[in-house]
Regions:
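A structural signal for multi-pass alpha-helical bundles of membrane permease subunits
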Residues: 3-288
Length: 288
């Protein structure tokens, strides 16, 4: 028995040490530096208290980044969950080449975000514009990512295209847990497809809906790679997410301490949003 416990310790302790060294300790360092004026490379720094946090709320660039990120996250989360649920229901039906289509729809999830971003950057710049000119569509003949007002739509499109894959698989796994006898019984009672969805399907996949909503929102709030590959925050700062602002300001703009404070605030924001989502959606699960 003692040998078995020792084996568990030998497996657990190294993992915890690695997690602490490469995750927890740097995070605590970030909190520490958020109370200083360190620029990221100087040998000295001074403690400034909560000044960095105070100035964050006065910074228009920070406000614009939060506005874009929240707008982007809400739109992406809603679209991804609606489309992925519809696709999952289609893939769960008795159709030909069902396994083939399941593999095709999951393909975007295994591709690198940066690779997808650079590919779509090329498509928006060199392919879609040619299509627009040939079809006589003015809105498509110009690079969408170069528009101050519409660039975020292009980013949303790419994020949905790639993000929909994982959510579809999760919804599909939830749909496969529903006994077919329930649909047979509801058919005998005269229920239509819409009634079956709201009275049987959706209540029984509610836990999967909760997981997908939380994951989609969290991933959208943390968007970074896609912004770098598609717009790099431009044009101007029209598509600059909070993660992108923290990176560029902290590592390229000499604002390490200032953006450390920003990252602390943003961590709290994401944690609060996730907790609220989980509690609200889990309460709905029990009500259903």
């Amino acid at each position: 028995m003692a040998k078995r416990k020792a084996a568990f310790y030998w497996m657990t302790v190294p993992a915890l040490l690695l997690f602490f060294v490469f995750h927890t300790f740097p995070a605590l360092q970030g909190v520490f530096y958020s109370f200083t004026n360190w620029n990221g490379f100087a040998k000295t720094y001074e403690f400034v208290g909560f000044k960095n946090y105070y100035y964050l709320f006065q910074d228009d660039n920070v406000g614009n980044a939060y506005w874009f990120t929240f707008k982007f996250a809400v739109v992406v989360t809603v679209i991804i969950n609606v489309l992925s649920l519809l696709i999952a229901m289609g893939l769960n039906a008795s159709i030909k080449a069902r396994n083939f289509f399941r593999g095709v729809y999951f393909l975007p999830n295994i591709l690198s975000v940066l690779i997808v971003g650079y590919i779509f950057n090329y498509l928006f710049s060199n392919v879609f514009t040619v299509w627009g000119e040939n079809l006589g569509l003015g809105w498509l003949s110009t690079n969408l990512l170069g528009s101050q007002t519409l660039a975020w739509v292009g980013v949303v499109f790419v994020a949905v295209w790639q993000g929909i894959a994982l959510n579809t698989i999760l919804y599909l796994s939830g749909l496969q847990t529903i006994p077919t006898q329930l649909y047979e019984a509801s058919g005998l009672d005269g229920a239509n497809k819409w009634q079956e969805f709201w009275k049987i399907t959706f209540p029984l996949i509610a836990p999967f809906f909760t997981i997908n909503m939380v994951l989609a929102m969290k991933n959208a709030l943390m968007v970074f790679d896609l912004i770098v590959a598609l717009t790099n925050g431009g044009p101007g700062r029209a598509t600059q997410s909070i993660s992108h602002l923290i990176y560029t300001g902290g590592f390229e703009g000499g604002e390490f301490a200032y953006q450390s404070a920003n990252s602390v605030i943003y961590f709290i924001v994401i944690a609060v949003i996730s907790i609220v989502q989980i509690r609200y959606l889990q309460r709905r699960e029990t009500d259903m």
